């Protein structure tokens, strides 16, 4: 009876060869392919409410990014000891702790932006994006991958917020990066630009209906780009 030999090339797969594609996939999923705002359409309430300029949009985006990264890391770190039956309340407590920390930091170092964002900073606790990534990804994957997933998802939301905020600020006020120094410091005053010299901007752009119209335009552009690929 002859023995069949398995070619060595069939089992020549190492984690090192696969690992780079994992990081790339997590990044592209979070920023573009599975963007929490433009694909999943999650967290629209704060997105539409505070994106009337770049400063507010960037402030909320960075806060959400930090919360996603921190909570994903902590939940993944303790995923094996968190009881399955009460995991959701525990996730909410972890998220609330991270949000409170970010809220206190914003209150201390970026108070004008904190005042402008108002209730939408503490409402990050109830954001479907944060609890969704905790349940769907962080509770099932390694700490490093979970932290990077939180960063990528947060970055995708931040970019969406900033683009929408820029469109609304330009059309509504004719400026770009106005008040950014309130978030990033006095050096950011040099970034302010007057793009449209109008007696009065289009008020609709900085009102809630303008947010819906702007988001619809961004979604349309993304769909066109995806179809051409």
From Swiss-Prot:
UniProt topology in membrane: Multi-pass membrane protein
Places the protein is found: Cell inner membrane
Transmembrane segments: 58-78, 82-102, 105-125, 147-167, 201-221
Chief location category: membrane
InterPro entries reported for this sequence: NqrDE/RnfAE, RnfE
Gene Ontology terms describing biological process: electron transport chain
GO CC terms in record: plasma membrane
Enzyme class, UniProt record, top EC level: translocase
Enzyme Commission designation: 7.-.-.-
Keywords, alphabetical: Cell inner membrane, Cell membrane, Electron transport, Membrane, Translocase, Transmembrane, Transmembrane helix, Transport
HAMAP family named in the record: RsxE_RnfE
Physiological role: Part of a membrane-bound complex that couples electron transfer with translocation of ions across the membrane.
Subunit comment: The complex is composed of six subunits: RnfA, RnfB, RnfC, RnfD, RnfE and RnfG.
The protein, known as: Ion-translocating oxidoreductase complex subunit E
Taxon lineage: Bacteria, Pseudomonadati, Pseudomonadota, Gammaproteobacteria, Pasteurellales
């Amino acid at each position: 009876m002859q023995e069949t030999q398995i070619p060595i090339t069939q089992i020549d797969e190492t984690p090192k060869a696969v690992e780079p594609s994992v990081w790339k996939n997590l990044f592209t999923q979070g920023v573009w392919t599975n963007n929490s705002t433009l694909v999943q359409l999650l967290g629209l309430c704060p997105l539409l409410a505070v994106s009337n300029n770049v400063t507010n949009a960037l402030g909320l985006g960075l806060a959400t990014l930090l919360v996603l990264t921190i909570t994903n890391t902590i939940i993944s770190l303790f995923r094996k000891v968190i009881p399955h039956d009460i995991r959701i309340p525990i996730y909410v407590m972890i998220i609330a702790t991270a949000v409170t920390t970010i809220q206190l930091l914003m209150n201390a170092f970026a108070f004008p932006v904190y005042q402008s964002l108002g209730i939408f900073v503490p409402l990050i606790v109830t954001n479907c994006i944060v609890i969704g990534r905790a349940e769907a990804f962080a509770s099932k994957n390694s700490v490093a991958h979970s932290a990077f997933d939180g960063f990528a998802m947060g970055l995708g939301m931040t970019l969406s917020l900033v683009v929408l905020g820029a469109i609304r600020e330009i059309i509504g006020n004719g400026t770009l990066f106005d008040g950014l120094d309130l978030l990033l410091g006095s050096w950011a005053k040099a970034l302010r630009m007057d793009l449209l010299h109008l007696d009065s901007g289009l008020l609709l752009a900085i009102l809630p209906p303008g947010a819906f119209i702007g988001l619809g335009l961004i979604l349309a552009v993304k769909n066109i780009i995806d179809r051409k690929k």
